[in-house]
Amino acid sequence: MPLKKLLQSPRPASNVGEEVFFYAGTALGTVVFVALVLGTQMGLAQSRAAALPLQAAAILGAPLPRESASIEAVLTPPLYPQRDFGVVEPNVLAGTALIFNLADERILFEKDIHTPKKIASLTKILTGLAVLENLNLNSKVTLTPEAVATFGQAGNFDAGETFLVRDLLTAMLVQSSNDAAQALADAAPQNILDFINKLILDLGLEKTSIATVTGLDDADNHATAFDLMRLILYSSDQRELWRLMGLPQATIYEVKNQTPHELFSTNKLLGKFGVIAGKTGFTTEAKETYVAIFQIAPDQRLGLVILDSPDRFTDTQTLINWANRAYQW
């Protein structure tokens, strides 16, 4: 197998197998060359730090900067952010955690990101994408008794009430209303779950499975943090989706009687620590889950995924504080 094809493998270098040892000598020579070149530009200490990730990949079989990194990306690492290896990796409570750069998809921190975990209401990001593709935001939806009977009281809806699609979408993404999610799914002209699972297939989210639009524990909705990273990257240009996930509160009105429904975000970190937008999730089996986009520098935004956590907001603060100290922006 050519070296370029090896480095472009969709699996981490540690999973490539015996072939990585065949090319270790070549890769190690490349490490030395890159270190020397970088040394002339940024000093010996910095060049050694810059060469470490590639050296680890070549010798130890550690993951490359991106799971599908090209040889050009590996041999020409971005100047910023620069890792300060004097700052040790954070100790997070979550079973799974991930921070990545939205601009170049570079993974900055990872913990068990390829093991499928239950995602709870993070499912509603996929449901939101399906709603935006299949329903007119200005169309009307009347809540059925079945929709209102869905577990949870978020939104404080009654059967027979009518709302615009955009308002139910707001309730689903701001206050994580299960009633709103089910009502939107029922109103769609095509099966929402079929659309979601086709989208999963199209995006290549190989370890993601969705069986309900809400994410409740009665169905096995699971994904890996790596798949959720790819979902965030794909959905980041859906401004309405992320605008709603960035609202700390909202008021929607029932169409017939103009009855107001006050909504308050479940995302308690909005506007703090640079957090711009995000979605929370919780079930007994999934524990606390969270995805977010946050501002780390004036022109730098990072994505974050937390799964299987007893305290997602503490984990998030730990990771954001670490990212500020561990990288030069």
Language model features: what each stretch is:
Residues 36-52, 327:
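Hydrophobic single-pass membrane-insertion segments
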Residues 13-14, 36, 96:
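A subset of signal/propeptide-processing and intrinsically disordered low-complexity segments
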